[in-house]
Regions:
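FIC/Doc superfamily catalytic core
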Residues: 1-229
């Protein structure tokens, strides 16, 4: 589940490739879906249309026949050396992945994992301690409004400009990065305890998972057992 996925992206030898995206998806989401939402054998992406529906059809995912080419471009963009700020580029990857909607289910979770994964690849391992899912969930209406605004602007101008999404992320997620997070001294003390053998690898994994998945949010032991496994 999610624990395996976080461990997978924490390993910097697991670079962002199409094959690794597929592996990450299967271990965190794909293997737990009902049959009708699973990927076909030998398929890395969905094999049919998908619609995001609210009170109406909010978004139609990219036609499935085009997904291999577009996902290859997305992965190439992730690997490309650019002068863009890493936080901005991570948010662009997040938007593009969810916009393409390569799966029948779990696209939002995968977009957030890809976001964190890219930051880890750029050397920001501390990103794994950020409860991004909670920040997005708490601003869900603004999250979807940003997507809608991008699409509406595209219909008018013919240009896909992700600025509204970047503004959303800067204000609603990145602005909160210092909120309720462990202080540097706390992290250093924990790492030292781990080196000295006072903390086991299992305890380390559990602590990292709690920080990433819940942040300062309250949770029950039952929920932790279900999520962490």
């Amino acid at each position: 589940g999610m624990k395996q996925g976080l461990e997978f992206i924490a390993d910097r030898s697991h670079t962002i490739t199409e094959e690794n995206l597929f592996r990450l998806y299967q271990m965190t989401i794909g293997d737990f879906l009902p049959a009708e939402d699973r990927l076909l054998p030998e398929h890395w992406y969905r094999h049919d249309s998908v619609y995001i529906v609210g009170s109406k059809v909010e978004h139609t995912g990219l036609p499935w026949q085009k997904l291999p080419a577009y996902m290859a471009e997305l992965v190439a963009f992730a690997a490309e050396k650019t002068e863009q700020n890493n936080l901005i580029k991570a948010a662009i990857l997040h938007f593009a992945f969810a916009y393409l909607h390569p799966y029948f289910d779990g696209n939002g979770r995968m977009a957030r994992l890809l976001h964190l994964w890219y930051l880890v690849q750029q050397g920001y391992s501390s990103a794994l301690f950020v409860p991004m899912s909670r920040f997005v969930e708490e601003s869900r209406s603004r999250y979807y409004k940003a997507y809608t605004q991008v699409e509406q602007n595209q219909q008018i101008s013919g240009v896909l400009d992700v600025t509204p999404f970047l503004v959303y992320f800067a204000k609603s997620v990145y602005h909160r990065l210092g909120e309720d997070q462990p202080q540097p001294r706390t992290l250093q003390a924990f790492e030292e305890a781990l080196r000295q053998g006072k903390v086991t690898e299992k305890e380390r994994a559990l602590w990292q998972f709690v920080l990433t998945a819940y942040g300062s949010e309250e949770f029950s032991t039952k929920r932790l057992e279900k999520d962490f496994g």
